[in-house]
Swiss-Prot record:
InterPro entries: GPCR_Rhodpsn (IPR000276), GPCR_Rhodpsn_7TM (IPR017452), TAAR (IPR050569), TAAR_fam (IPR009132). Changing F117 to T/L: Abolished activation of G(s) G alpha protein in response to trace amine-binding. Glycans are attached at N19. It comes from Mus musculus. Keywords: Cell membrane, Disulfide bond, G-protein coupled receptor, Glycoprotein, Membrane, Receptor, Transducer, Transmembrane, Transmembrane helix. This is Trace amine-associated receptor 9. The keyword Disulfide bond applies. Olfactory receptor specific for trace amines, such as triethylamine, N,N-dimethylcyclohexylamine (DMCHA), beta-phenylethylamine (beta-PEA), cadaverine (CAD) and polyamines such as spermine and spermidine. Trace amine compounds are enriched in animal body fluids and act on trace amine-associated receptors (TAARs) to elicit both intraspecific and interspecific innate behaviors. Trace amine-binding causes a conformation change that triggers signaling via G(s)-class of G alpha proteins (GNAL or GNAS). It comes from the Eukaryota. It is a multi-pass membrane protein. Specifically expressed in neurons of the olfactory epithelium. The chain crosses the membrane at residues 34-58, 69-90, 106-128, 149-170, 197-218, 257-280, 294-314.
Length: 348
């Protein structure tokens, strides 16, 4: 006979000998180990997967295209999520405590928001690039140049970093909800609730690029169907051997658009539940249970590990580049000029 008269287990605190310490939620050893394994794996995939993308695009000259420079910058944002955000969030999620100091808590929040929005803005720029490439493949090289790609990269980073640090590092996110912030504040916690004005701006910054991406990829899909029917209609007049240059280019660009469109869809699936919850929370006095919030946050984080897997699955040139990098053949003098793809596969 136990139950009702058994003494309750002592309450655990993040810092046992500190007044005002946060309460610590403990897991049993096996669930704790599994959580560390699953969340840690996400961080490792984000770091090493995106590092492979960056090395491949910067090293191999065949991959020096405006689109791929955008992809490399996108991979850089995801790589930084894996380095500066995910390891610390892993400890916070499993231990339910923040052990890395108040100063890095602010930086962690700023990095988190900056790099995630940088990913979104890069994907929006890539959708514009793919739209031009598919709808006008012959003049595309003169319209979306390396300079234009560089401008898109610079603006994506500037707006995401400016937005993040102007809100969280200055404390502007706490205006009007000071009582809630005081109630949530404890030693060993790292929370950054957004007031209604800032969460609305956050939603708009997510919603507007998303609308642009969905519209452009919808247009790309329609154009691709039209081009496919046109090519099929002319197949009897000219066999595959006489396929025009324009048709080969269009086929290559459609394939690249499809792969990057899948990356965009994965991003939206990962992000949409979190954004919807953030908006609802701000207007419903932050009612989301902690474990639900953690799941939504990690869906966003895991997106940083997904893009390299998508590239590896759809791009033969990326798989070949990985083999060359891992085997150390990239250190050969002429490795940067290696032919990574056949003519029909395209450069992505």
């Amino acid at each position: 006979m136990t139950s009702d008269f058994s003494p309750e287990p002592p309450m655990e605190l993040c810092y046992e000998n500190v007044n005002g310490s946060c309460i610590k939620s403990s897991y049993a050893p096996w669930p704790r180990a599994i959580l560390y394994g699953v969340l840690g794996l996400g961080a490792l995939l984000a770091v090493f997967g995106n590092l492979l993308v960056i090395i491949a695009i910067l090293h191999f000259k065949q991959l020096h295209t405006p689109t791929n420079f955008l992809v490399a910058s996108l991979a850089c944002a995801d790589f930084l999520v894996g380095v500066t955000v995910m390891p610390f969030s892993t400890v916070r999620s499993v231990e339910s405590c923040w052990y890395f100091g108040e100063s890095y808590c602010k930086f962690h929040t700023c990095f988190d928001t900056s790099f995630c929005f940088a990913s979104l803005f890069h994907l929006c720029c890539i959708s514009i690039d793919r739209y031009i490439a598919v709808t006008d493949p012959l003049t595309y090289p003169t319209k979306f140049t390396v300079s234009v790609s560089g401008l898109c990269i610079a603006l994506s980073w500037f707006f995401s970093v400016t937005y993040s640090f102007s809100i969280f590092y200055t404390g502007a996110n706490e205006e009007g909800i000071e009582e809630l912030v005081v109630a949530l504040t404890c030693v060993g916690g790292c929370q950054a609730p957004l007031n209604q004005n800032w969460v609305l701006l956050c939603f708009l910054l997510f919603f507007l690029p998303t609308v642009v991406m969905v519209f452009l990829y919808g247009r790309i899909f329609l154009v691709a169907k039209y081009q496919a029917r046109k090519i099929e209609g002319t197949a009897n007049q000219a066999q595959a051997s006489s396929e025009s240059y324009k048709e080969r280019v269009a086929k290559r660009e459609r394939k690249a658009a499809k792969t990057l469109g899948i990356a965009m869809a994965a991003f939206l699936v990962s992000w949409l539940p979190y954004i919807i919850d953030a908006v609802i929370d701000a207007y419903m006095n932050f009612i989301t249970p902690a474990y639900v919030y953690e799941i939504l946050v990690w869906c966003v984080y895991y997106n940083s590990a997904m893009n390299p897997l998508i590239y590896a699955f759809f791009y033969p040139w990326f798989r070949k580049a990985i083999k060359l990098i891992v085997s150390g053949k990239v250190f050969r003098a002429d490795s940067s000029t290696t032919n990574l793809f056949s003519e029909e596969a395209g450069a992505g």
